């Protein structure tokens, strides 16, 4: 059964490693050392729920509801554009230290709400967990399926806590104005690139629904 566990672990790691809104948010909270472990836990728990839903049958709901998929996609586009704009606005702020200080003053609940939006409004999360993991894990028998799910869940917990702790450890070097400017430019550009890719998919969903 450990074979299925490591298959899930490897696949989960491959899907979670690329820079996306979730990773960018966890990294930034780690750099600020602001509720970073709590955010890592909430991200991992969110992944746990999505992974279990995808592998144990929830994928059928998304695949059989094209309108739901279209709504999720365009909601994700809007959120990623907003998130990318915020990062680029901070990067090109004339007083970067003041902009960073304003971000640091965000309350716990605002940070939690942003984290939930970053996770649950990201269509790629549903495609990864419901489509990819759902199609692969759904073919397994009950016991192997549990080990496969445990492997992918382990990848999420290891990655998010590792990323948060590493970012907090490197915080003294990454909190400089130059480093913050570079990080925010990269994050903003990546968010807008993902939004553009999702918009193309969203247009395809709309055209398919109208045909």
From Swiss-Prot:
Spans through the membrane: 1-21, 37-57, 68-88, 111-131, 147-167, 182-202
InterPro entries in alphabetical order: Arg_export_ArgO_enterobac, LeuE-type, Lys/arg_exporter
Q: What is its main location?
A: membrane
Q: Which UniProt keywords apply?
A: Amino-acid transport, Cell inner membrane, Cell membrane, Membrane, Transmembrane, Transmembrane helix, Transport
**Reaction(s) this enzyme catalyzes, per UniProt:** L-arginine(in) = L-arginine(out)
Which GO molecular function terms does the record list? L-arginine transmembrane transporter activity
Domain of life here? Bacteria
Q: How does it sit in the membrane?
A: Multi-pass membrane protein
Cellular location(s) = Cell inner membrane
Spell out the GO cellular component terms annotated for this protein, sorted alphabetically and separated by semicolons: plasma membrane
Family designation: Belongs to the LysE/ArgO transporter (TC 2.A.75) family.
Described by its record, this protein's role is as follows:
Involved in the export of arginine. Important to control the intracellular level of arginine and the correct balance between arginine and lysine.
- The identity of this protein, by name, is Arginine exporter protein ArgO
Q: Which gene encodes it?
A: argO
């Amino acid at each position: 059964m450990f074979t299925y566990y490591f298959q899930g672990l490897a696949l989960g790691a491959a899907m979670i490693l690329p820079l996306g809104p979730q990773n960018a948010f966890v990294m930034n909270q780690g750099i600020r050392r602001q509720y970073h472990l709590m955010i890592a836990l909430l991200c991992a728990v969110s992944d746990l729920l999505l992974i279990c839903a995808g592998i144990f049958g929830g994928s059928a709901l998304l695949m059989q509801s094209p309108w739901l998929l279209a709504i999720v996609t365009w909601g994700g586009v809007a959120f990623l554009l907003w998130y990318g704009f915020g990062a680029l606005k901070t990067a090109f702020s004339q007083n970067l230290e003041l902009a960073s200080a304003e971000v640091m003053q965000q309350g716990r609940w605002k940070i939690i709400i942003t984290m939930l939006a970053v996770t649950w409004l990201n269509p790629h999360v549903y495609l990864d967990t419901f489509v990819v993991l759902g199609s692969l894990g759904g073919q397994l028998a009950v016991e192997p399926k549990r080990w496969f799910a445990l492997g992918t869940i382990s990848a999420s917990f290891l990655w998010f806590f590792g990323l948060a702790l590493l970012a907090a450890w490197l915080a003294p070097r990454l909190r400089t104005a130059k480093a913050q400017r570079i990080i925010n430019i990269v994050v903003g550009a990546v968010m807008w690139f993902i939004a553009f890719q999702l918009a193309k998919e969203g247009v395809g969903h709309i055209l398919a629904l109208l045909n």
